[in-house]
């Protein structure tokens, strides 16, 4: 039995959880999310708490106990508070702008990188180099932030590129000059 999986999920006011045989639906003030369940994982709503349990304590299902508890907890937190990721752009001439439903990135290439912003996400750009991605689906926020970062990941010699706010990038020493 998982230590995380045993913990109950408390439901704040305004959050509604519906459980069917194959999926869990969470509806809150910021939006609604659904998660499919595999056979053998049971979800019960008891008053103000959600409990995740296994049909039997098989080793095959034990992996999913903590996973589904965390996924449902992230759905509850997302529909009430939301999630946010911040990215920093470091480099001469690197800048970003939001144009309608596109994120326009100038990253030193001969062409601008235009990324479509997924539905359900809000993207804000401050000072042309700070990108804030927010939404109620943790997976979608993290995936889009990773997609933006992958356009120009930080390089190890000068540290130029797109990085998560607060991310530490190890720098390498440059090539030593040859002695004559």
UniProtKB/Swiss-Prot annotation:
The keyword rRNA-binding applies. InterPro entries: Ribosomal_uL6-like, Ribosomal_uL6-like_a/b-dom_sf, Ribosomal_uL6_a/b-dom, Ribosomal_uL6_bac-type. GO terms for cellular component: cytosolic large ribosomal subunit. One of its GO terms (biological process) is cytoplasmic translation. It holds the Pfam family Ribosomal_L6. This protein binds to the 23S rRNA, and is important in its secondary structure. It is located near the subunit interface in the base of the L7/L12 stalk, and near the tRNA binding site of the peptidyltransferase center. HAMAP family: Ribosomal_uL6_B. Part of the 50S ribosomal subunit. Belongs to the universal ribosomal protein uL6 family. This is Large ribosomal subunit protein uL6. It comes from Protochlamydia amoebophila (strain UWE25). The gene is rplF.
